[in-house]
Amino acid sequence: MSMLESFFDIQKDNKALFEELEIAKRHELCMEWMNQWPVMSLSLKAVEGNDFSTAYMQLVYEVGELFKKHEYLMESPVLNAEEKKKFDDIRYGRAGKIEVMRSLQILSEFLSKYYNKSVILLIDEYDVPMARATSNGYYKEMLEIMKGFMQALKDNQCIKLAVITSCLKIAKESIFTGTNNFVSNTITSSRLNEYYGFVQNEVDRILEDAEIKGKGDIMKKWYDGYHFGDVDVYCPCDVMCYVDNLQKNPNAKPDEYWKDTSDNAIIRSFIDYAGASITKKLETLMNGGYIIQRVDENLTYDYLHSSEENLWSLMYLTGYLTQVRDYKIDDQIIRDEAQEQ
C-alpha cells in the first residue's frame, strides 16, 4: 500500500523511485497517475483491544493521525471556519462518534475541495477491527462503527477509486451494504497474481544482482509458500531480509522474519476445540502431506464459527495453506508457525 501511496500522492515527487522500473516505460499512464492525485492512506491493523472502548479509541487515534497528514488544509481559505473546527476536532480526538464514523467522507470532501480533484482512498487491513471484535466479544458494537466508517465508499463523488486489503473477501458483510462496483481480487484470482509478491524470475534476478550464489533452493524451500491464481509467489519481506543477511554473512541461515507479524487468535480458537477429523487433517499437513477440502471465499467474521470446517477456508485465506493441485502447507516458515498454534 505504501508503494501505491508513493505512486499516486500529489504531495510527493517520486519519479526517481520508479524511473528504472517497468511502469516508467508507460509514459502516458505515468503522466496521468504518478503523483497526480490526493491520497488518503490508512491502516487499521492497530485497531484492536480486549474491549470495545479500547479498540474504538485506537480507531480515533488512527483517524487523527490521518488528518494530521493533511494539516495544511487548516491554513487554506478553501475551508470555512466551521469546516476547520470539524477538522480540528477529528485531528485531536475531540469529535463525537458520528463525526468519527463519517471522518473518511469528511476528509475526502475537504481534499477534493482543496485540490479540485477526486481522491484515492487506500485502506490496509480493513477487517482487523472485525477480527479482533469477533475474538473479544464486541462484534456488534464494532460492526456499527465500521459500517458508518465505510459509508465513505457509498455514492461518494469525491472518491476516484479505493484500494482495500483484507484477509477475508469483501463480500456479504453488512459493513458494505449499499456499496457497489467492488472488484475483488482473491488469492485464487489471476488478474493481479504476480504484482503483490515476488515471482520466480524476480527472485532469481534479486539473487543475481546481489551476487548471491547457491541459495536458490533454500530460498524456495523457506519462502516460496504461496500460490496466487496460477503463479507461485514468494513473500517479499522474507526474501529481502534474507538477502540482506546473506550480503552481510554469506553463511547466514534462513530465519522466520514473518513470524509474529499477525494475530492468530481466531485460528487458535478453532484448533483448541478441534474434533478428531480436523486433528487428523492437521497432522497430515504438519507431515508435509495434502488434503482435499472445499474452501469458501465468502466467509464473514460473524459466521466463522458456524462450522469447524471453516477452519480450512480461514487458513487458506490467511496464508497458512496454499494450493498446489491440492491444499498443503508449502512453506517452511508457515509449517513452523502452524505447529506452534
Roles of regions detected by a PLM:
Residues 1-341:
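Phosphate-binding site recognition
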